[in-house]
UniProtKB/Swiss-Prot annotation:
Enzyme class: transferase
Record-given protein name: Phosphoenolpyruvate guanylyltransferase
Binding positions for phosphoenolpyruvate per the UniProt entry: 147, 163, 166
GO biological process, one term: F420-0 metabolic process
Entry EC number(s): 2.7.7.105
Organism encoding this protein: Streptosporangium roseum (strain ATCC 12428 / DSM 43021 / JCM 3005 / KCTC 9067 / NCIMB 10171 / NRRL 2505 / NI 9100)
Origin superkingdom: Bacteria
Record-linked PANTHER family: 2-PHOSPHO-L-LACTATE GUANYLYLTRANSFERASE
Pfam family for this entry, one: CofC
Coiled-coil residue windows: none
Functional note: Guanylyltransferase that catalyzes the activation of phosphoenolpyruvate (PEP) as enolpyruvoyl-2-diphospho-5'-guanosine, via the condensation of PEP with GTP. It is involved in the biosynthesis of coenzyme F420, a hydride carrier cofactor.
Gene Ontology MF terms: GTP binding; phospholactate guanylyltransferase activity
Amino acid sequence: MLKAMPASESSGWTLVVPVKTLVAAKTRLSEAAGPHRAALAVAIACDTVEAALSCVIVARIVVVTGDPLAAEALGGVGAHVVGDPEAGLNAALRRGAQEAVRLAPGDAVGALQADLPALRPAELALVLTAAAEFEQAFLPDAADVGTTFYGVRPGVPFTPGFGGESRDRHLRRGAKEICLDGIDSVRRDVDTPDDLRAALALGLGPRTLAMVERIRGGFPSP
């Protein structure tokens, strides 16, 4: 069980971002992205992390990955990188949360998906501010099936339930669902070409946009 300082002593949020090995990343974009798939996955993750670090109430990002190329790129944008225990997504998140508590025992800890290339820091701040009102909270993805964010107050056990129909799983476990207007960029994860087109309509981060422009034929304008 993760232990942290009381909420009143918290100085902000530490977010844990899991990043797959590039050989396994974004396989549903393979047909459209072709040989650029791995580079696109790195670009999406880097834009996500950079935007999150620009959020005024995010103190640091802990990236969990077993891929050396992804680790180098994400470390370059300011993430603290730790190795992936290779035991699944939620195990990776728990490993990152352990490191987060070690680095900053007074911070709230959250898990943020790595595939939010349109992420806006101000919208993330709205989500984190809302999440801080509850012991544990989560944000569903744009399809209302999965989860893009899960977070806990300092001192609350960190028990993420990502994967598949994780919205229902988090609800069953007692996490509070965050329901706000104006936070589309935090819900818009990208797994398919249609998802990427939807993110493009919101406004992509610079690295992802540059990659899309390189492979534009695979991603027609929205």
